[in-house]
């Protein structure tokens, strides 16, 4: 699952954003990708042109439900303090891939989730 498809918070634009490359890479591995974004879902839908392996969600927790990993791509404020127990209990594998390094790794791990911050040592 992916939280955040817009190229930056506050925008509905997805062009040249990192989410597009991630989605394409996942599709190349035959992965169905579930995405939440507060503004960019219409633009993402146009970009995907009806691709059957892209599922768009109005609710971030529905996007993450049963997911084997959740990648934070755009650091929208609504993602800053998620309900960690809800994520842990609903995900297939509670793995958080923090592409913006906004979460405290020790705290997330202490909540019972796996954590990897992209670019962290």
Where in this protein do the model-derived segments appear?
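Structural/interface elements that position substrates and couple domains in central-metabolism enzymes
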Residues: 1-121
